Amino acid sequence: MSKREDGRLDHELRPVIITRGFTENPAGSVLIEFGHTKVLCTASVTEGVPRWRKATGLGWLTAEYAMLPSATHSRSDRESVRGRLSGRTQEISRLISRSLRACIDLAALGENTIAIDCDVLQADGGTRTAAITGAYVALADAVTYLSAAGKLSDPRPLSCAIAAVSVGVVDGRIRVDLPYEEDSRAEVDMNVVATDTGTLVEIQGTGEGATFARSTLDKLLDMALGACDTLFAAQRDALALPYPGVLPQGPPPPKAFGT
């Protein structure tokens, strides 16, 4: 089988590097690298929930996605300068939010909010899938932080891991984890978000340059899910290390009666 321009086989991911504790202030901070794509993912904990969520006893999770002006080869203006978010930015922010809410019991948070921020430092295709994969690790660290602070009603509110990967048809071949060079000329382009329990969270797929058969869809999903298994292993390896920051001291346990 012939190799791709970057030397990979069709089913191979780019090198994946997950660095926890990349910045100090958030409860969770992760730099994730999919090859040349680099995304900083942070998870911040704040007391309270949106107004429409108050008095429910439920927590909330929201996410924002953005790209640095120089993340691509040509600098672009910050969207804050333009005065409005692009449709793409809003779409990806909502995708990250939906993906992570699929794995957490919001009731366990109490009326607290976890805010996920994903900032693309360097873009070479697959920024949204890298953001989701890295944001899960940041979320897991934020949950550890909340648990140490005694703010969780359930010490294990995460029901599964979440990862995402791009897959597509390029030059008539099914390939996974497309860099920009492949993504820009793909006949079929798809993003798959999955759990480590074998279920799917979201599938975004389009025939960019051609229609595709049901059998091709099945092959795309098979390759994407196989790649997600590799990403889950990378997440587990990263999270096997100790929490990278200083954990808060929770409230003391209640005294036993008569002591």
UniProtKB/Swiss-Prot annotation:
Which species expresses this protein natively? Mycobacterium bovis (strain ATCC BAA-935 / AF2122/97)
Q: What is its EC number?
A: 2.7.7.56
- Output this protein's name: Ribonuclease PH
Q: Where does phosphate bind?
A: 88, 126-128
Its job: Phosphorolytic 3'-5' exoribonuclease that plays an important role in tRNA 3'-end maturation. Removes nucleotide residues following the 3'-CCA terminus of tRNAs; can also add nucleotides to the ends of RNA molecules by using nucleoside diphosphates as substrates, but this may not be physiologically important. Probably plays a role in initiation of 16S rRNA degradation (leading to ribosome degradation) during starvation.
* UniProt xrefs under NCBIfam families: RNasePH
Give the GO molecular function terms: 3'-5'-RNA exonuclease activity; tRNA binding; tRNA nucleotidyltransferase activity
Q: Does the keyword tRNA processing apply?
A: yes
Q: What is the top-level taxon of the source organism?
A: Bacteria
User: What's the top EC group for this one?
Assistant: transferase
Q: Which family does it belong to?
A: Belongs to the RNase PH family.
Subunit text: Homohexameric ring arranged as a trimer of dimers.
Q: Which reaction does it catalyse?
A: tRNA(n+1) + phosphate = tRNA(n) + a ribonucleoside 5'-diphosphate
Keywords (A to Z) from UniProt: Nucleotidyltransferase, RNA-binding, rRNA processing, Transferase, tRNA processing, tRNA-binding
User: What biological-process GO terms show up in the record?
Assistant: rRNA catabolic process; rRNA processing; tRNA processing
